[in-house]
Curated annotation (Swiss-Prot):
Pathway: Amino-acid biosynthesis; L-isoleucine biosynthesis; L-isoleucine from 2-oxobutanoate: step 3/4; Amino-acid biosynthesis; L-valine biosynthesis; L-valine from pyruvate: step 3/4
Signal peptide, first to last residue: none
Catalytic activity: (2R)-2,3-dihydroxy-3-methylbutanoate = 3-methyl-2-oxobutanoate + H2O; (2R,3R)-2,3-dihydroxy-3-methylpentanoate = (S)-3-methyl-2-oxopentanoate + H2O
Gene label: ilvD
Name of the protein in question: Dihydroxy-acid dehydratase
Species, as recorded: Caldicellulosiruptor saccharolyticus (strain ATCC 43494 / DSM 8903 / Tp8T 6331)
Residues annotated to bind Mg(2+): 78, 120-121, 442
Amino acid sequence: MRSDIVKKGFEKAPQRSLFKAMGYTDEEIRRPLIAVVNSWNEVVPGHIHLDKIAEAVKAGIRLAGATPMEFNVIGVCDGIAMGHIGMKYSLITRELIADSIEAMVMAHQFDGMVLIPNCDKIVPGMLMAAARVNIPSILISGGPMLAGRVDNKVCDLNSVFEAVGAYSAGKITDEELFALEENACPGCGSCSGMFTANTMNCLSEVLGMALPGNGTIPAVMAARIRLAKMAGMKIVELVERDIKPSDILTIEAFENALTVDMALGGSTNTILHLPAIANELGIKLNLDIINDISDKTPNLCKLSPAGHYHIEDLYFAGGVQAVMNELSKKGLIHLDLLTVTGKSVGENIKDAKVKDYNVIRPIDNPYSETGGLVIVRGNLAPDGAVVKKSAVPPKLMRHRGPARVFESGEEVFEAILKGKIQKGDVIVIRYEGPKGGPGMREMLSPTSALAGVGLIEDVALITDGRFSGATRGACFGHVSPEAAERGPIAAVQDGDIISIDIENKTLTLEVPEEEIKRRLESLGPFEPKVKKGYLYRYSKLVRSASTGAILE
């Protein structure tokens, strides 16, 4: 076995001595050594309970006859990091997580690993590591938070963000804001809507890297603990059969993930993460593939922020496997792909049934005939931008309005709360891209403020940054090339007319090309905002959002 290099033979006596210093017996050392990669911490509500998940995983590993060895990686809470310098450090942890797992697994030569993430960047970071080191691996998440309730109405973290805008506009009282603060997040788990964390946890199931149920079983349910034990047992089988991520993560698996993403109306951040994971295996997911899949995939779900349902509702309606089964009725799912169950996708989903067609629409009666995400292009975004079409108000599907230009999320947040944004405006937030930020911050605070003050159906927002999965409205992110690379977004001036046409997938700055070129040439080279530390190194290495913001 792979771990023999650190334990077998007389010359490995020093290594065995170190294992024995931790209390491992000869029998435990002889067995397959399984890394349990945990992201537990006391900072993130989605991770506060992962110690319990890890204990269940380790119990499963021991039941199956192998030896678990746990180590930890970092995890950032995007919600706590939102709206300040801390958000610059969110996306960049994806690479730190992948790199640190690579280092630990290669240094200690584990036979397999179980990955325990839950929140936004931790899931893709761990999947990138699995693809990179390519040893038998399985992912088991912590599970979604339950939705909150105030006055018998469901709510979630996004409700609190939007309430800040409503409070500043005098639309709600101190008591109403406090009630949301107290009740929107009722306990552990990844925030309860189809936000980035839950989207990625659902897609890990679709990719075949997690067991059925991983994306939707609530964090507080005993079924989550049972699933963790099953994952611990399953990794030993994967090691015995030598089933690696490269056997599972094929181009067809990524096509399945994109298809389900479109059906669920998932987070726009998947357009960063799926290409980055694929890149680790030498698979290129370009933006044209994404649009091709979106064009033929019906949108079957409207979960928060696009609708009032939450992940627990999706779970009780049949979960991700039921969505896949529904999509397979029109031949939209590759069925013969291998998964960590040891069975094919088709075998996994054949008995999955939709239990509530209000939550999961039937394939012949979708919310729309095309997917929830769309890539748009035009002279403002030559290399593309992404919008969550399923969360855009109908009257903003096509829009033309004057640009209001800002250099940071904080500037526009303040302008919204002070009433400086008018109906019809097109907000442009630039120098928030991977290099320009650096770190490509999420713009949830500005979009939530727009919703709170009542402008979310009348104002569009365009940025080279990105959006939280909780964002709703006509919000275009990942504009590429970014302003720091002197993309056309750097040339926009206040009052320029911007045209949006989501159905035709265009984003147009109504300024002559010669004038755009003249403006860009007058800017000179971009001066980095950060001159030291990890952010500085990241800004030097990161590529465009159109590539998944990977490092090179």
